[in-house]
Amino acid sequence: MAVSEIKATMKLKPLKAPVFHKRDKDLRGSFSDHLKHKESKLSPAQLEAFRNAYNFFTKDRTGCIDSHGLISTIAKLGMNLNTYDIYNELKCADLDRDGKINFSDFINVLTDKKLFLKAVVPEKKICLDLANNPGILLFEILSKFVETSSLHRKDIIELVSYFRKRFQESHSEIMWSSYGRRGLKSEICSPPRSSTAAFANSARISIMKERDLYKFLEALKRCNLRTDSPYSKIPVFPLFPDVDGTVMGKPFKDTQKIEMLRRKEPLTFFEDYFFNKRDWKTQAMNVKPLKSASGYSDDILAIDHLFKKKQHWTVTDAAAIKQHVKKATESYNLGIALDHRKEMLNLWKKIRGDLVGIESNNESFYNTFSTYTWSWNVCQELLSAKDLRLHDASMNKSSPSNSGLSSPSDFSESDPETGRKRKRKSSRGFRQ
């Protein structure tokens, strides 16, 4: 055989140049696969929690979630999404391609690692809106269930515990993927626009090492708060919202239904029901007047005498006398409150409270004075606005002329025109 023929048969193929970026990619993939944890099966409690969350959706006759049910559930939670995006989300969640989301599709989507990481740790250059990031709608709806406490507390605990565990298992993989994408580091000060990402960030802080936590705090301190932020200001609540102004806001849903239910409530004065005010004046009428010169009631003096008589007390003796001490203390507080109420009524007469509202053309002075009479003895106002109006009405009826609490001597003789105007206004008074 010729030498040329031997060279032709023994000719080797040319070596290919190594592709370093491909090798690096394969290395990252093998390391990522090595860090993958075996997906644990759902426990019966977790499966029941997912079932209850699935039952909260609006479903069709077959018990599945169709497009109309998804639209109804989104509207119920106050989320905004157009029809095209809803159909796109339905297509992503419909794994068996039957046009609906059954419970099997629901579980498979919410337990999928890629979709979970997509909802929790989105990349920086990917838009976090639901419209441009399909596949995370079910995670957002589940987060809304947790935020609004739509589910039972037991189910919420199971769901939060499950996703916290999933995030902790994926934490090492997240750190490696962020290392591979060095140019896509997320800014620590940018607030997450996804509620699921916010929950995940809180879980990340709980498992963060001390060194990483210090770095997180240092970066957080470098973020300057906006001076015009509403959270950096002290809130000022109006004393009387109906008088001080009206703040336009988003109208509540089913306002007519709520108004109808409110009108059906058999309540004479809604404020008494709302603040759970007790009728302390009726209780104070039953309190015996103070006869001793010390200024204390007979019950308190009897308890004081008992304390001086017996020096050593046991737990049984203290429990037996506890109710007597409580009763005597309440009687004393009611008596003090009743005396203070009389002083406040005298002050109302002295400052002519009914004329103050007439002169300023503002009836809110009744509420202002009522707030001023708040007492710790009964933990409420001693004189309500209703009590002051009833007092003025009784005083006007008892007076010989229907000129209110004012008398002709109160007006200046040198200004008869002003006196006639004030007398005309005071005779009109407020509507009782």
From Swiss-Prot:
Residues 394-432 are annotated as: Disordered. This is EF-hand calcium-binding domain-containing protein 3. Residues 420-432 have a biased composition (Basic residues). InterPro entries: EF-hand-dom_pair, EF_Hand_1_Ca_BS, EF_hand_dom. Residues 45-80, 81-116 form the EF-hand domain. SUPFAM superfamilies: EF-hand. The gene is Efcab3. It comes from the Eukaryota. GO terms for molecular function: calcium ion binding. Ca(2+) binds at residues 94, 96, 98, 100, 105. The keyword Repeat applies. The modification Phosphotyrosine is found at residue 273. Keywords: Calcium, Metal-binding, Phosphoprotein, Repeat. Residues 395-411 have a biased composition (Low complexity).
